[in-house]
């Protein structure tokens, strides 16, 4: 893991930034270039990144880029179609953020521990202030239509509220 940190010396951070830029180019051999050029990490959460070619890069965003590229290349999803993505155990929503940027019309469902749902709701609201986000506290009916939302954030005990065969 290549860390850019306040705890490191300037020389160590410069060395790590150079390694991260090299890793970016190494990823270009296995990641769809359209996806690689699209990604940039969020400023929400005050994470440490390098600015390279106008993109905010860190190790995590490059890993998510690889995942998005693999999904894009192995699933027959139309980029502009409305479909439903579910990320179980997706943490604060970093990967879902990339998926939503690429598949703009999708509904993204995050199933996570209740404590982490709080972080995810903050992160996704900061990144998508104009998108409709359904929080688990707003789910009061088993027959809610989650496809009317851009994001649905729910704890794992509410996964039973997802209808069978509703995830693409």
Indicate where each model-derived feature is located.
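Short, solvent-exposed loop/turn segments at secondary-structure junctions
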Residues: 44, 91-93, 114-118, 158
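Conserved SAM-binding strand-loop segment of SAM-dependent methyltransferases
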Residues: 148-156
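The AdoMet/dcAdoMet-binding core of the Class I SAM-like
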Residues: 1-14, 111-119, 123-124, 160
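A short acidic, Gly/Pro-enriched loop at the edge of an enzyme's catalytic core
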Residues: 160-168
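Conserved class I S-adenosyl-L-methionine
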Residues: 80-91
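Conserved Class I S-adenosyl-L-methionine-dependent methyltransferase catalytic core
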Residues: 1-80
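Class I SAM-dependent methyltransferase SAM/SAH-binding core
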Residues: 106-145
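Conserved SAM-binding loop of SAM-dependent methyltransferases across substrates and taxa
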Residues: 93-103
């Amino acid at each position: 893991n290549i860390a850019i940190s306040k705890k490191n010396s300037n020389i160590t951070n410069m060395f790590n930034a150079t390694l991260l830029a090299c890793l970016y180019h190494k990823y270009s051999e296995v990641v769809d270039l359209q996806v690689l050029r699209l990604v940039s990490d969020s400023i929400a959460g005050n994470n440490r990144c390098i600015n390279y070619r106008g993109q905010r890069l860190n190790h995590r965003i490059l890993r998510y880029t690889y995942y998005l590229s693999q999904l894009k290349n192995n699933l027959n999803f139309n980029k502009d179609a409305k479909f439903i993505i579910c990320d179980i155990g997706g943490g604060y929503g970093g990967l879902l953020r990339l998926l939503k940027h690429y598949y703009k019309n999708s509904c993204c469902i995050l199933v996570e521990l209740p404590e982490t749902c709080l972080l995810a709701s903050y992160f996704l609201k900061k990144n998508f202030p104009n998108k409709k986000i359904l929080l688990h506290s707003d789910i009061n009916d088993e027959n809610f239509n989650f496809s009317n939302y851009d994001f649905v954030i729910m704890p794992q005990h509410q996964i039973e509220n997802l209808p069978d065969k509703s995830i693409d």
